[in-house]
């Protein structure tokens, strides 16, 4: 199973927290000390906590669970999309729309509209419209794709959230808490760990650190899914006998 070592984390700068004046005292148990007015995260805590989170995500994937990757700030956006796509999972990487989980009924209607517009753009419907109407629909399609493209094939609520930056994505975390969906999150020294089921104390800004987390999670999800596919194949083989 995918695991991450102390050396990997040091190389990626996972241990660099935020400036000391921005700290959240609830993160004290995970802070090693300060250097040049920047908090240093205790990787002796982070390494086992991250590997424990990976093991749990592996189990969720092995039982066909859906993982929703959430990272809407610019530093994480592209990497979040790539990681989710690489393991056939789902993502929100632009803006978290309030109610995305708690008001799933409405979101489902917007997804239906997005799929209808996609069909229209491909079956020649747009070409039959006036220029103005076609432009309006194209803009609507782009807007919906931006907001919902990463969850349009999710087919229901996710079984877990993997979040980059608990502070920035606090609305998503609150919605998951309300619905009892487990939250796995990268929590920096300026963030509140409350509401996060699997806290991963670490830098949430450095591209290398963000890529390290996402790469490991995508790998563990792929592994979990292949276990599920292998057991399905075994079952059908037994039935055939």
Curated annotation (Swiss-Prot):
A GO molecular function assigned to this protein is:
structural constituent of ribosome
InterPro entries on file: Ribosomal_uS2, Ribosomal_uS2_bac/mit/plastid, Ribosomal_uS2_CS, Ribosomal_uS2_flav_dom_sf
Top-level taxonomic group:
Bacteria
UniProt keyword annotations, A-Z = Ribonucleoprotein, Ribosomal protein
**Annotated Pfam families:** Ribosomal_S2
**Annotated S-S bridges:** none
SUPFAM superfamilies per UniProt? Ribosomal protein S2
**One GO cellular component, as annotated:** cytosolic small ribosomal subunit
For biological process, the GO terms are:
translation
Q: Which NCBIfam families match?
A: rpsB_bact
- Homology family: Belongs to the universal ribosomal protein uS2 family.
**What is this protein called in UniProt?**
Small ribosomal subunit protein uS2
Q: Which organism is it from?
A: Salmonella choleraesuis (strain SC-B67)
Q: What is the lineage of its organism?
A: Bacteria, Pseudomonadati, Pseudomonadota, Gammaproteobacteria, Enterobacterales
